[in-house]
Amino acid sequence: MTQKTPGEIRAEAEAALKPLGQQRINVLAELDEIEKDVRPLIAEAVRMEVPYRRINEVTAVAPNTARAWAKAEAEKGSGS
């Protein structure tokens, strides 16, 4: 019975991480694309006075994030 070297143990640990790590990277990239589309919708919902709590329930976007996105969209729209 041979013992594994620290390098072999690290390589095995890295190999175990790779599939789920790659899946996570892909999901985050997809989320970035979705956020590009949802940001103006959330900004409009804020402008229409949809409660932040409801926005969070529907989108899982935190209230502070919704506020920041709405502010950024308003500034972009006003040309500031």
UniProtKB/Swiss-Prot annotation:
GO terms for molecular function: DNA binding. The keyword Transcription regulation applies. Keywords: DNA-binding, Plasmid, Repressor, Transcription, Transcription regulation. Residues 13-32, 56-75 bind DNA. Repressor for the transcription of certain pIJ101 promoters, including those the from kilA and kilB loci. This is Protein KorB. It comes from Streptomyces lividans.
